[in-house]
Amino acid sequence: SKTLPFLISEKGMTAGVELAGPGAVAEDLRLQYRYLDLRRPSMQDHFIKRHRIVKRVRDFLDERGFLEIETPVLTKSTPEGARDYLVPSRVHPGHFYALPQSPQLFKQLLMISGFERYFQIVRCFRDEDLRPNRQPEFTQIDLEASFIDEEFIYELMEELTVRMFAVGGIELPRPFPRMTYREAMDTAGSDRPDLRFGLRFVEATDIFRNTNYAIFQKIIQAGGCVKGINVKGQSDVLSKNVLQNEYAKQIVPSLGGKGM
């Protein structure tokens, strides 16, 4: 074997030792030297855990009688919630394939064909603007089953989620809390409330029914309601001045709120 044209000091041998966390290096630089970035133990651990989670998903759904069936990637455009990514066809000039936003139609075909339980670890593509909960391509656990009720889905997804988190050494408390859509909207104003946030909306319409405050009057007369958040023991922090200036003019608009 040939010798290296330079000497490697023992001090430079850092196998298995992470010299700096991801925050210590600019993301652009990490991506430029991705092959070095992926040598870090923490990065490799992400890939290893993902592999084990996906394997756990496959094993669990196989135990429950689900078949993993791949669906086409180059397909016809179908109505979905975003724009399609289009791929020009070489064989048919002027025509395009569409990358799937989801395998919705294909899995419905499988159901009516007699495959009663299907799943797929599938790549999806959506041409939409980047947001915290949106990206152009993503992988999802896609499944479908025939002749079941909602209780079947509740129990299936709870058990699957518990097993997935267990791969990372996280034990989730059971049973999972359940909340109706109406309860979520009434108490949190969202159909996906963050349960870590303990403050819930409190109905205050009756308190303000005879108020002279024009905005509240207009809302109540139109059949709307007035709700608030009861923040106890924070009067010295959330003063009227802070609420009217810092929160109403800066924080609320930055989060998409119209006013406060």
Residue ranges and their predicted role:
Residues S1-M260:
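Class II aminoacyl-tRNA synthetase catalytic cores and aaRS-like
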